[in-house]
Amino acid sequence: MKLWGGRFVHESNSFFKKFNSSIQTDYKLVEQDIFSSMSWADALLKSGVLIKSECNEIKNALQKLLCIVKKTPNIVLDSNLEDVHSWVETQLILLVGDLGKKLHTGRSRNDQIATDLKLWCKHKIKDLFNRIIEFKIELIKISDNTQSVIMPGYTHLQRAQPITFSFWCLAYLEMIKRDEDRLKDALKRLNSSPLGCGAISGTTWNIDRENLAKSMGFKSATNNSLDSVSDRDYVVELASVASISMMHLSRFAEDLIFFNSSESKFVELSDTITSGSSLMPQKKNPDSLELIRAKSGRVFGFLVSILVVLKGLPLSYNKDMQEDKKGLFDALNTWSKCLFMSSLVLKNLHINSINCLKASKKSYSNATELADYLVNKGITFRDAHHITGQIVLEALKLNVPLEKLDLSIFKKYSSSIELDVYNFLDVISLLEKRNSKGGVAPKIVSKAIICEKKQLKI
């Protein structure tokens, strides 16, 4: 059944029908469409459009339909109808006859699709919160178990200063917590119902939109009908939240790919999330991480795509908006899968603490400590920086780490350097001194872990 056509003389071109149809994508909204239709039936009852028996008959039929699509959601795809709304209404009429034709009274597909999509987003956000929590738990578990694992921290992909693997985990935990906060904020802004706005200007029927909104689980009804049917800010915002988080997951993946490489050997990925080569028997490839890194591009692509779709649209609804769903479904599903895969990667991650420690003692990553030592001796930091650079150059020529240099070489560049310099250059001492808020000092890291475990009740 087609929901329009009375003013048309000629049938639609067959290719146009397929081109115009969205059912291959929006069939995923069938449960939301049925749910919102049941709430709409109640609203029509209260407004006098339906009597009690009619409302019950419609809702019972919709409930039967809901049970069917929950078992076989792809049943919608067996039709050649224009969209999911057409399918639900057609099935309803088959079940209750002409009574089903009353349901669309006062309602437009414009407010209907906006409502359905928001309902789907709310449901998907619950799944995303669960995935985020899973990932946070795995990060905290590894962080808790690796507080004593010293490794190099990097800037410009060069060894910079010693940190701990635990500290590295907490860095990504901070990122994912910000992602979680952004998702919470996005949920707040989409948690209003456009149902009852009609095509663009509201409805002439006495619909209590606030009560209708709450019956569907929304916090409130939207304020302006013209804006409500054309608003896709929540789609853009969710795409943005997903993109930022996927950027974080991509960096997480890149770090672990590097740590897992033959050049680093800081970690070893589990056999369960790696693959081999069809030619080279020795290979164990970090495919899980490489795919996370690659899939971020798909999510970024949708963010740009939806912005371009919306940027030139006049108020209010335009068919262009049909292009909002396929990319959104894919972006949020991709984000969810990548969060889950990231958790799987961490579950059985083996950390080679010996290799981590060896690497942290190379490349003069304790040079900053030497400069700070000189500052403690009364030398300005800029002069201390220059003196330390000269000493590092000497150590490079001798191929000796700073902590192994003879005291006479230190004194060659500054008479202020005494035997106590060796305590300053010790990697454990170095970590303990970084005890400012957010620092790598073991007591600071331990306190952060305890706090996070308490919040997540683990």
UniProtKB/Swiss-Prot annotation:
It is an enzyme of class 4 (lyase). It is found in: Cytoplasm. Pfam families: ASL_C2, Lyase_1. Its EC number is 4.3.2.1. GO terms for biological process: arginine biosynthetic process via ornithine; L-arginine biosynthetic process. Pathway: Amino-acid biosynthesis; L-arginine biosynthesis; L-arginine from L-ornithine and carbamoyl phosphate: step 3/3. It catalyses: 2-(N(omega)-L-arginino)succinate = fumarate + L-arginine. Keywords: Amino-acid biosynthesis, Arginine biosynthesis, Cytoplasm, Lyase. The keyword Repressor does not apply. The keyword Cytoplasm applies. GO terms for molecular function: argininosuccinate lyase activity. SUPFAM superfamilies: L-aspartase-like. One of its GO terms (cellular component) is cytosol. This is Argininosuccinate lyase. It comes from Buchnera aphidicola subsp. Baizongia pistaciae (strain Bp).
